[in-house]
Curated annotation (Swiss-Prot):
Disulfide bonds: none annotated. CDD domains: CYP71-like (cd11072). This is Cytochrome P450 71B6. It is a single-pass membrane protein. Belongs to the cytochrome P450 family. Its main location: membrane. Gene3D superfamilies: Cytochrome P450. GO terms for cellular component: endoplasmic reticulum; Golgi apparatus; membrane; mitochondrion; vacuole. GO terms for molecular function: heme binding; iron ion binding; monooxygenase activity; oxidoreductase activity, acting on paired donors, with incorporation or reduction of molecular oxygen. It comes from Arabidopsis thaliana. Its cofactor is heme. It comes from the Eukaryota. Its EC number is 1.14.-.-.
Amino acid sequence: MSLFSFPISTELLPWLLLLLIPPLLIFFLLRSPKNLPPGPPRLPILGNIHQLGSLPHRSLRDLSLKYGPVITVYLGSVRTVVVHSPETAEEVLKLHDSECCTRPKLSITKSFFYDGLGLGFTKWGDYYRDVRKLCVLELFSVKRANSFRNIREEELSRLVNSFSDSASSGSSVDLTANLAKFVASFTCRMAFGLSFQGSGMDNETFLELFTEANRVIGKFAAADIFPGFGWILDRISGLDSSRRKSFQDLDTFYQKAIVDHREKKKTEDREDLIDVLLKLQSQETKLGSSRITDTHIRAIIMDLFVAGVDTSVITLDWTMAELSRHPRVMKKVQAEIREHVGDKGIVTYDDLEALVYMKMVIKETWRLHAPSPILIPREAMTNFKIKGYDIYPGTRIHVNAWAIGRNPDVWKDPDEFIPERFVDSNVETKGTSFELLPFGSGRRGCPAMYVGLSTVEYTLANLLYHFDWKATEEVSVEEAPGLTSHRKHPLHLVPVNVINRKL
């Protein structure tokens, strides 16, 4: 007799089925959530992936117009809830922050972010709290950020002088590429105490490395939506190998910087972030249950580069693009800056607080072009409700910051670039106003927001103070696919010297 045969007579089989069907129905009805947020019908296996397109934040917003501000979609087999209004964002990021402040297990976390040893993709727990405390108190405090002002000034001087040379010859500049080089070089010196030249790389090589990292990070991984077999698809598509190569290139660069610091080979005397982390390592500081290792240091630096550089470049690039498309706003913000600064020849940090209209321009850019259109996903740890709907443990939760910024129930003429909407407005960007979330909010809010905001304000103010800007062609506002909201086409503008003085 076969081990897999059962001696059941055919006469008994119908009765057996009748006995089994009711309890099976009860089981499936009880285990199936009844009160999920509404959403579109899904396909077997694929779920709703076919409805997301290359710009998911736009596709999801369109679905929310039909199904409401909180919707359920399935990414393959993974149940995902997406919120699209300030009210529902507040429920997620404030009211239920403690119930959904962990991260889902994503393939990129293991393959690129040191299996969650950094900050952005780390699971909630003692380790996360320790890393965040370290970042807030040691790496990104106001005092620490201000200690890097001279570096930012030196890098900006190079940028302004380069643009001044282009202005003298009447040639256009690739503003997108130049802004990326500037922010990456500043961040490199802040983290490692060395410039590109000191790192053994030229600008183009480093930017190619960084651009490739952002490209592979921004791609959907089949492993994240088809648990169990998606990794096979990622290997076939080449995503797995491209991630490993990009990670290895950056990891090698970071480790070389650590070794050079130990051997006192860095090119600057200032204390940089590697110095700070190595000092904490020598003091046997613990993160969770482990002492700080070189791997922890590399993981923290990886988060800094991936998040910090990208956010500042995106903001500056979109702001200059929108100003080029809106001459009235460009003239108004330049007038504010030039009237306040006068003939000093440079905008200083002390000037920034008085530049109220410029701050509105930056806010309006963030409203229309959130650097992260959909915030990094959270994962529910317990049962709770959003807008009366049941959220179950293991559900991924996304906040569609782009959709909130264009919500017509919140903003008049939401698709128009009108900085004046922030006159007498109490909307701010630190995470307590859920209408505008450039840095996230709650336990997962960005700890480096002061560094990022200082970079954006100081750079923008000086570019608008020193130069008028002319577009050589119609400025495109088309978005590139990916997790962050890069413009699809480089921004080419002609600088015109106004403050005729090199820095």
